[in-house]
Structures are given as structure tokens and as C-alpha cells.
């Protein structure tokens, strides 16, 4: 059994990988798909490899999100790993996007960052990537620990984009997928990766003893837009709380 996992079983880690390759998104057993008036809830969109897509209309602050069961904890023999492969569709000109982990199935944007990088939290504990159209460039690594915001960190380390070119600009591009990965240690410290390249570290980004769930959410600005998710992965140790 790898270090950290439960030692009384050969399945010492809890994992879930959803490749969205079914006929329909599983909103009975795995995902909550929430949507405000005018938008479209996340649903399977017929494309190569299988994706799900959610949309928002032009009404400012309309929210579309999908989130899973609140069962994952960083201090259960971590690390707690969350990875999404996502792409904005149509526009990144405005509106807010959150990709990561949160602490509830509430219909909300767990963390958002203003155009001047001021963080606002709806969740008490969450950790993830935030992007605000019309704001400063690049994804921001963000966390909130027991209602205390951590300082957003700009993700601008060199990585390889979808065209194979090295770049330090992580700003999402319409119709181009990026792989966003968060690794939360048992201490609550979190490392952030884009397309496999390390981007940021936030110390005590989130409370390690709080149960979390996968969470993808975005708000409209004044432009109708969509977000595609190609897959979602999460894993953590199976060790019980002591």
C-alpha cells in the first residue's frame, strides 16, 4: 500500500475518474448540475472522446456549476489530488470561472477573483484555479481556509500549451483545453499545476480535516458562453480520521 493510505486493505486510496463518455451525465449518483435561468446545465456534448458542457446567458452573475459528493479529505492519508481538463467555449472576455475543490453542493461560485485580483469567498473551505475575464491575465491559484482567504497567486510559470509551444501565459483561450491539477498535502498546503507544469504553492490553502468535493463553476458577464470538461479526477487516502 502506498504511504498514507489505509493499511488494512489493498485498496488504500479512494479514487474517481469520470471521462464523460456515457450517454448522459450521471446526475443521480455522481454529479449535481445546477443552473440559473437562461443557462444550460452541464450535460454530455457529443464530441470526440466525450465531454460535458454547461452554458450561461448574458445576464450578469448567472451561475452554472457541477459538483460531486463531499467525501474527500486531505488528512486521510493524502495527498488529495483533483484534476480537471477544461476549455472555455465561445468567449473568455468576461465572467468568472472556478475549477477545483469546495466544501458543499451549494449552488454557488466557491471563490471568485475581481478584475483587480481581490478574492471573494462563498465557500468556507475551497481550493482551486480562478479566472476573471476582463481582469488581469492568467489563471490565479486560490484558497480559503476556515473562512480566511489566502492571497491569490498568479500562475505564470513556463508550461507547454495545447499547440506544443512553451509559454508563461496561462490565460485560457477559447476552445483550447487545459489540464488543471491541484495537490493538497496533509498539512493543507496546496500545489497547482497546468498541463503538468508546476505553477504555484499556497501554504494552508484549505483545512485538511474538512470534507471536500470536486467543483466546476462559472458566472456570466455580459457575454453568453460555455465551458467544456473533458474529464474529472479525484483521489485521496482511505485512512479514517483519528
What is the predicted function of each stretch?
Residues 26-53:
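Extracellular glycan-recognition surfaces and repeat-rich motifs
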Residues 20, 82-84, 175-185, 190-192:
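Short tryptophan-centered beta-strand motifs in secreted/extracellular beta-sheet-rich domains
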Residues 86-88, 184, 234:
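Hydrophobic beta-strand positions in extracellular immunoglobulin-like domains
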